[in-house]
From Swiss-Prot:
UniProt KW Signal keyword: yes
UniProt note on tissues of expression: Expressed in guard cells, hydathodes, leaf trichomes, and vascular tissues of leaves and roots.
Organism of provenance: Arabidopsis thaliana
Compartments (UniProt record): Secreted, Extracellular space, Apoplast
The protein, known as: PAMP-induced secreted peptide 1
Listed transmembrane segments: none
């Protein structure tokens, strides 16, 4: 009978562990579940503030062609 090397055993153990973690431990529906709309509208205000912040970041970006020269 042939002897099995430790590296082969290690690879099989890692693959079985990954399969177990992927299919048994982790099956979550979503990473973050959004809550229902609350009566005070705080979630809507947060989304609007986030949108305005991202818009202001995009406005700060330089527009036009890239500068020519070394490193570009």
């Amino acid at each position: 009978m042939r002897r099995v090397s430790w590296s082969t055993v290690l690879i099989v153990v890692v693959m079985v562990s990954l399969f177990f973690v992927e299919h048994v431990v982790v099956p979550a529906a979503a990473g973050r579940v959004l809550t229902e709309k609350s009566g005070d509208g705080s979630a809507t205000m947060t989304v609007e503030k986030m949108k305005s912040t991202v818009d202001s970041w995009f406005q700060r970006l330089a527009s036009g062609p890239s500068p020519r020269g070394r490193g570009h």
